[in-house]
A protein has these predicted regions:
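Catalytic metal- and UDP-sugar-binding loop of GT-A-like glycosyltransferases, i.e.
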Residues: 1-3
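Conserved donor NDP-sugar-binding/catalytic core segment of glycosyltransferases
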Residues: 6-42, 70, 113-114
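Acidic/His-rich active-site region of diverse nucleotide-sugar glycosyltransferases
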Residues: 28-64
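Conserved nucleotide-sugar donor-binding catalytic segment
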Residues: 51-132
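Cell-envelope/extracellular polymer assembly enzymes that use nucleotide-activated donors
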Residues: 89, 166-171
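C-terminal, non-catalytic tails of nucleotide-sugar-dependent glycosyltransferases
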Residues: 123-165
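Active-site beta-to-alpha loop of glycosyltransferases that engages the nucleotide-sugar donor
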Residues: 172-183
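Short, acidic, metal-binding catalytic loop of nucleotide-sugar glycosyltransferases
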Residues: 186-193
Length: 193
């Protein structure tokens, strides 16, 4: 919870329900981005179920996150050397060690936007730090991949090294739309190295 944001009235109750039912090591909820005074909803963030692949490409778990205290202590908590992206780093480290991660598919958090936030004023620094945090995660998890910035703010592309003799299968679900196969194949040929 950031210092200037708001919890929905039912937030703590829903977290308690989740803890009792699922016993997660980490939990997170959906959220809304609201105006500085909280009077207007600017954007809804309906989070997906936990996906390590998606988390590596976008830090979609941001606010209304809960952690098992023992696991947080075991991992050393926030990395104080990171001025920005310390939350993404912690979520990646917890995801590496967690047995259970739960998503509460309900808006429990109001994130107030303001011009002084790091996401608004320090976009280049956020991208550089988050890319480095992701690279550390890839190395810790033994993945032969390089973290690079994606096509837009706060998106990343973990580029996995594939041996020259390694085969890659691509499934193209088109269901009776043969013309889509041609488009997909042309796109793959144009963008694959």
């Amino acid at each position: 919870l950031d210092h200037d944001d708001l919890l929905q009235p039912q937030a703590i109750y829903r977290v308690a329900q989740c803890v009792l039912a699922d016993d997660p090591d980490m939990l997170y909820s959906d959220e809304v981005l609201v105006s500085p005074d909280g009077s207007q909803v600017l954007q809804y963030f309906h989070r997906p179920a936990f996906s390590p692949e998606y988390l590596r490409s976008h830090p979609y778990i941001v606010h209304m996150v809960g952690f098992r205290t023992a696991l947080l202590r075991q991992l050393g908590g926030f990395d104080e050397t990171l001025a920005i992206s310390q939350d993404y780093d912690l979520i990646l480290r917890v995801s590496e060690a967690a047995s259970r991660i739960a998503h509460i598919p309900e808006i429990l958090y109001q994130w107030r936007t303001h011009t002084g936030s790091a996401g608004h004023e320090k976009m280049a620094q956020v991208m550089a730090t988050s890319t480095a945090v992701l690279q550390r995660h890839l190395e810790r998890t033994g993945q032969q991949a390089t973290s690079v910035s994606g096509v837009s703010f706060n998106f990343f592309e973990p580029r996995h090294q594939i041996a020259a003799d390694q085969r890659v299968a691509i499934i193209i679900p088109t269901k009776n739309y043969g013309h889509l196969v041609r488009q997909c194949v042309d796109s793959i040929r144009a963008t694959t190295k």
